[in-house]
Amino acid sequence: MKKYIMIIPFLIVAALTSCDSYVTPDPTAHKNDSIKSVLYMNQYDQFANKGQYNLPEQKLGTKYWVVVNSTSNTNDYSDNSLRTSLIAESIIGLTALAVNEDRGTTMVWSDATSSEYIAMQGNLSMTNEGKASVWELLEKTDIRQCIKGYVLCNMLKQESLAAATVAAHVYQSIIVDTYNEAKVKALGYTKTYDASSKTSATAWTEFKDSCNNNALVLMPTLTANNKGFAIAHKLMFINYNKKYASTASGDNSSVCKEILAWLKPLSPVIGWEQNIDEHTFVDLVSQSGNMMVPADWLYNLPLTSANYSGNQIGLATVTNPRYINFSDTTSYASFFLTDGDNVQWMVNSFENSKYYLNNDNLTTKISFGLPICNLATMMPNLLTSLLANQAPSNSIIEYGGAGYMYADDFASNADRTNLLAKHAALVGNHMKQRRVKILGLFCNDVSSAAAQEAYQAYISQNDQLIGVIAVQYDPYAGGNGNIFWFKNSNGINIPVITTRYSIWNLGNSNSSNQGTPAFVASKINELAATDKSTYSLVAVHAWSAFSDIGSSNDLIAENTNGSYYSATPASWCMKRLNSNVKVVNTEELIWQLRMKTYPEETKSLLTTFY
């Protein structure tokens, strides 16, 4: 049985992953090699700040309160509603800001109940003072000393919430809806600013000189999420749609363009927008030379990111190419799960039996795109957990490149050549320090000259990168499996493999290269019948559900009443593949391709490690 090893300081973890032979390398057996070689698993960089840390860094206090009834965006008048969440988020932000400015030592944690948040709370090196409501917190001395008053907003004027968020850090005041104003006044707080008739545009005009330009929060109206982070770091905060989940009332695209041009290049834009073609706003961010970070339904970002630069632990498990069977005469297929750029997904039903801990992960050798760069700064403890729970047969991919952007138009409205190189270095440093060997990139057109310019930039900045996978925005499999080659800084040929097929529930039909597990299996078999050396990279759409139709080869039936996701539908596809198609993880797919295309170069490279 083949074993892959993961080296954590002073720890080697071995696990069975395939039916090929593998023996754990013994360094003493290689001490007399004619060519000096090193252990492949040791090919990574030590953790260090090499300019890759682009998220504003929060200081950590000495104690914290847990605020209850603080995660609801329900627009009603209860004590567990958006109105109380606004107060809670502003308390979270103002106490964190006070810690950052050495005016306080007390912080506040929102009582999010998922297992991921519970685990991250357990890692907080602060004293837990207990639970309290927002009203109880507002009467505590260590909280009051961080608050100078309140900023008034009006839920009936949705954009006032965004304006109030910016005003909150300018005036060091909590956000209060008109409904709760009297109650807050009764506690002794006075109004410092009236944002009840303000908009995102007026907030930008009035407060831009009071905001830091090293990040931006972009969130829908009528939500409280991420307001605390914006306040803690004195950031601009904007909604794209002027009304929640509606384009009918207009948008703030022109204001967004101004803000994005004002931002320091390569800044994270944290959040998302609802009920709009994502390409509309993501492309604005991408063209500006900044990174959209899908992170809307998050809580506690000030605390989960605190002191992140000193909290880097954990490496990806990698496939050692010295122990790959390169004598196979089969075609190869490799599955990877999409949407790994989505940071909020990582704390909302990702590390479970449906996805990351699916029992079918081992047999399918499915690869996982993860937001490695962003988790390293936003939730380093969660990233440590994800890497520790990685199944050794499943490759890890840095998915998106420190966010969701389109590589072929990244920084097209800015200094593209310079920013591409800097962004590639940022991504490369994160990857090398986490021992992640594959980069996944999104493009509008994966075959365009601009895309190839970007591929070269990322490959040139990372000499530990073994390959790139490229996904087209629409359709994901628009690259048709085309492969491009580029030389890295050492003159080694590195492939860029475009997605050939996609397992995607399209309803009552399949497209030319996207569809049900049965359909994709038929396409892989058809291709393998024409050429014994084929390399099929298959995207498994994260949000597509399928039904189990057993041994039937019906090409549409799996789309009906689906309840299975991720590796499980991929396993049905795999079971239908002919014997001349071998399923491998994405690292092995890349190495097999490199050996086939550049055999002498690859053989020579393999002698340099064991």
What name fits each language-model region?
Residues 1-4, 20:
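Positively charged n-region of N-terminal signal peptides that target proteins for export
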Residues 8, 14-29:
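Bacterial Sec-dependent N-terminal signal peptides
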Residues 22-23, 291-316, 585-610:
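A recurrent domain-boundary module in secreted/ectodomain proteins
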Residues 26-307:
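Preference for solvent-exposed, low-hydrophobicity sequence contexts
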Residues 254-272, 338-365, 375, 431-434, ...:
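Catalytic grooves of carbohydrate-active enzymes
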Residues 277-280, 378, 547-550:
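Short, charged/polar "capping" segments at the starts of alpha-helices
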Residues 301-386:
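Active-site beta->alpha N-cap acidic-glycine motif
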Residues 371-437:
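Substrate-binding cleft of extracellular glycoside hydrolase catalytic domains
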